[in-house]
UniProtKB/Swiss-Prot annotation:
Role of this protein: Part of the Rad50/Mre11 complex, which is involved in the early steps of DNA double-strand break (DSB) repair. The complex may facilitate opening of the processed DNA ends to aid in the recruitment of HerA and NurA. Mre11 binds to DSB ends and has both double-stranded 3'-5' exonuclease activity and single-stranded endonuclease activity.
Origin organism lineage: Archaea, Thermoproteota, Thermoprotei, Sulfolobales, Sulfolobaceae
Catalytic center residues: H86
Catalytic class of the enzyme: hydrolase
Cofactor remark: Binds 2 manganese ions per subunit.
Cofactor: Mn(2+)
Organism in which the protein naturally occurs: Saccharolobus solfataricus (strain ATCC 35092 / DSM 1617 / JCM 11322 / P2) (Sulfolobus solfataricus)
Protein name as it appears in the record: DNA double-strand break repair protein Mre11
GO biological process: DNA repair; double-strand break repair
Binding site for Mn(2+) 1: D9, H11, D50, H189
Gene name tied to this protein: mre11
């Protein structure tokens, strides 16, 4: 029996919304995947790119990667990978972070010139090739000739049929070379799989955690985790491995019923947190009439102790203005014009307007801006 764990887009070191907790989540998810590999006695792990979130990962990210990968080495499970776009330096002459792990004999970096052989299965890999170099990708793909269907190809590219936006894809499914039994794709964060007429499988493992809010819908439909591949015969048989991640939710509030909406969300989260250890992240859509941001954030304060983090994801409020016109006076300086506009039309007090003016003048100083925002909203940033 030959078992392979296919994972991708782990983005080690990513600190979503600058939250230390999210960086720890990412390491924990990677560790869980290694736990699964060891428990299932897999013969190899294949990783389809974006092992790290950036091409120059922090010391923390490197140390955690080394610690976790050492556990695989201790039980003789090889870790095969290709660099993704996040792993790849944008300047020539710089090494990918994988080289450090390779020097420590913790991973094998795949290429398309010579396969890695594991129990008779050929494993090829093509590193991420950017859109401007599509011709290089096409050439590399056309040169591949596996000996049999007991073969795997790792890629980290945008695929037109899945990402049909200008500049987001570098290849089409029809460009995949014939003859492989399993095509292990990365780059796209939502799971996807297709069994072709010849029995071969094209599979996107997806990211094992929710890296962006647009992944929430896909997570709710398909889950997050990995694919466990049984390659004992000529063609692969896939099983879906799901893992538990910190929940992220898109919620909607209306400024007309803002207190009621927020309390409803709060009550739901209190109930959720009774059975879950991980407080969720909220992506808030605001509807209704326009509301001053400082007042809006004050209304959101009841969510502070039930959510790890919340943000205004979409502001879909509208402003009703009756015959509003504003002529810039010629006898006043810019400061006075700004103060007058903020107090007369935005209904700020004069003190608040002065604070906003100071924030505008010191926009390049995060420290000053954050201090002023604290005064305006009463929220620690």
């Amino acid at each position: 029996m030959v078992q392979i764990l296919h994972i991708s887009d782990t983005h080690l070191g990513k600190r979503q919304y600058s939250l230390v907790e999210r960086e720890k989540d990412i390491y924990d998810i990677f560790s869980q995947l290694v736990d699964i590999a060891i428990k299932e006695h897999v013969d190899v792990i294949i990783h389809s790119g974006d092992l790290f979130d950036v091409s120059s990962p922090t010391t923390n990210a490197l140390v955690m990667a080394i610690k976790i990968l050492k556990r695989l080495k201790d039980v003789n499970i090889p870790f095969l990978s290709i660099p993704g776009d996040h792993d790849t330096p944008k300047r020539k002459g710089y090494l990918i972070p994988h080289n450090i792990l390779s020097e420590l004999d913790l991973i094998k970096i795949l290429n398309y010139e010579k396969p890695y052989i594991i129990k008779g299965i050929e494993v090829y890999g093509i590193p991420h090739i950017p859109t401007v170099s599509k011709s290089i990708l096409v050439s590399a793909l056309s040169a591949l000739r596996p000996k049999s269907s007991r073969s795997i190809l790792l890629l980290h590219q945008g695929v037109k049929q899945i990402l049909p936006y200008d500049g987001s894809w570098q290849m089409e499914l029809g460009s995949l070379p014939k003859g492989f039994g399993y095509y292990a794709l990365g780059h796209i964060h939502t799971r996807w799989r297709l069994t072709q007429d010849d029995g071969s499988v094209i599979a996107i493992a997806g990211s094992p955690d929710i890296m962006r809010e647009e992944e929430i819908e896909g997570y709710e439909k398909f889950g997050k985790g990995a694919y466990l591949i049984d390659f004992s015969k000529d063609l692969p048989i896939l099983s879906t491995i799901n893992i538990t991640v910190r929940p992220q939710k898109v919620v909607t509030i209306n400024t007309k019923n803002i207190k009621k909406d927020i309390l409803t969300i709060r009550d739901d989260l209190i109930e959720h947190n009774k059975s879950e250890n991980n407080k969720p992240i909220l992506h808030i859509i605001v509807e209704g009439e326009r509301m001053r941001k400082d007042l809006l954030y004050k209304e959101l304060l009841p969510l502070n102790d039930v959510a790890l983090y919340y943000r205004i994801y979409k502001d879909e409020t509208t402003q009703t203005v009756d015959n509003l016109s504003y002529t810039l006076p010629r006898d006043k300086g810019l400061d006075k014009i700004i103060i007058e506009y903020l107090t007369k039309y935005e209904k700020f007090s004069e003190d608040e307007a002065n604070l906003i003016l100071q924030m505008i003048k010191n926009v390049e100083s995060d420290e000053i801006v954050n201090e002023i925002l604290k005064k305006l909203t009463g929220v620690n940033l």
